[in-house]
């Protein structure tokens, strides 16, 4: 197999059918594993209609957790490229979606896929937009300048099988995506960011859902930092340019919201942010500043 795709679901998903339809029309050698913990009665009946060629459903009557589900299904797979997708995302209608990922993975160990949020008029929508914008900026900077990054956004990313096995898969931690990316980073993995392919992330419509998600992120990041800060500090002292983009990945809301409130133009904000970070890191970089600005408009 060229690529193995993994979609963990808790309860149910109203987007997985569209994802499976898209993948069925992709002209690559593929296999898809959908692990469902505690499926609802409605979704259990729907699963029968979703089964197709090279699509395997793993049904768990109890909640085993995302890390366990992914590790188990990876063990059943054979693809050299492992693509991990959350069940609450939307994919573009691109007949070469998987082919582009496979091509990009020929030159990297971990691929962070571009996340897009449609900026609506609500405050939550705007806040989520700036959060994911910062994720994309961080990944692009890390990919373009260092080809390394200690974090990844787990809603959509790919990893080579040999690197997955090298770090012994996911661990049962709150932030399993950042954790596996950090362990791969410490194993000197290559990191890349793709603008060719993207996913669209869901923006929660009420404060309770938003708060629950952000609380989980905050706890996960705190526990991650407590476990890894010593080892990462040794690397960051040698290469501080890896650390600065990571700050915006881990704490996007505060940084982005504050600066966007002070500087009304997002284009101007991007310009000042990149110029400030890299002019402090390396005196040879400012000549690339204007080239940076042009690139950032592609976010």
Report the location of each language-model feature.
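Glycine-rich, basic loop-to-helix element that forms the pyrophosphate-binding segment
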Residues: 60-77
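Basic/Trp-rich segment in TM-proximal cytosolic loops or flexible interdomain/linker regions
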Residues: 146, 204-298
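Long helical/loop segments within the catalytic core of UDP-sugar-dependent glycosyltransferases
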Residues: 68-69, 100-166, 171
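Catalytic donor/gating beta->alpha subdomain of glycosyltransferases that bind UDP-sugars
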Residues: 109-136, 172-173, 182-245
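Short, acidic, metal-binding catalytic loop of nucleotide-sugar glycosyltransferases
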Residues: 21-30
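Acidic donor-binding/catalytic loop of UDP-sugar-dependent glycosyltransferases
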Residues: 87-103
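Short aromatic/hydrophobic "clamp" motif used to bind/position activated sugar donors
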Residues: 82
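A conserved acidic beta->alpha catalytic loop
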Residues: 35-45, 62, 89
């Amino acid at each position: 197999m060229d690529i193995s795709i993994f979609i963990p679901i808790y309860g149910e998903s109203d987007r997985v059918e569209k994802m499976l339809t898209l993948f069925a029309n992709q002209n690559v050698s593929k296999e898809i594993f959908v692990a469902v913990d505690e499926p609802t009665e409605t979704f259990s009946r729907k699963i029968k209609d979703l089964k197709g060629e090279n699509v395997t459903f793993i049904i768990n009557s109890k909640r085993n957790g995302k890390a366990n589900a992914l590790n188990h299904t990876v063990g059943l797979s054979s693809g050299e490229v492992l693509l991990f997708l959350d069940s609450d995302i939307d994919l573009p209608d691109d007949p070469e979606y998987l082919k582009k990922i496979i091509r990009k993975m020929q030159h990297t160990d971990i691929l962070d896929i571009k996340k897009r949020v449609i900026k609506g008029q609500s405050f939550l929508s705007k806040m989520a937009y700036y959060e994911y914008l910062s994720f994309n900026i961080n990944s692009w900077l890390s990919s373009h300048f260092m080809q390394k990054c200690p974090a990844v956004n787990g809603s959509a990313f790919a990893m080579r099988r040999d690197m997955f096995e090298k770090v012994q898969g996911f661990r049962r931690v709150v932030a399993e995506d950042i954790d596996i990316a950090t362990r791969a980073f410490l194993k000197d993995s290559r990191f890349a960011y793709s603008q060719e392919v993207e996913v669209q992330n869901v923006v929660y419509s009420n404060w309770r859902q938003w708060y629950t998600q952000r609380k989980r992120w905050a706890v996960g990041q705190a526990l991650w930092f407590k476990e890894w800060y010593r080892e990462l500090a040794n690397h960051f002292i040698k290469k501080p340019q890896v650390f600065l983009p990571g700050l915006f990945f881990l704490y996007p809301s505060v940084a982005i919201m504050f600066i966007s409130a002070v500087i009304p133009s997002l284009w101007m904000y991007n310009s000042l942010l990149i110029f400030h970070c890299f002019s402090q890191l390396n005196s040879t970089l400012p000549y690339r500043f204007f080239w940076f600005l042009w690139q950032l408009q592609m976010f």
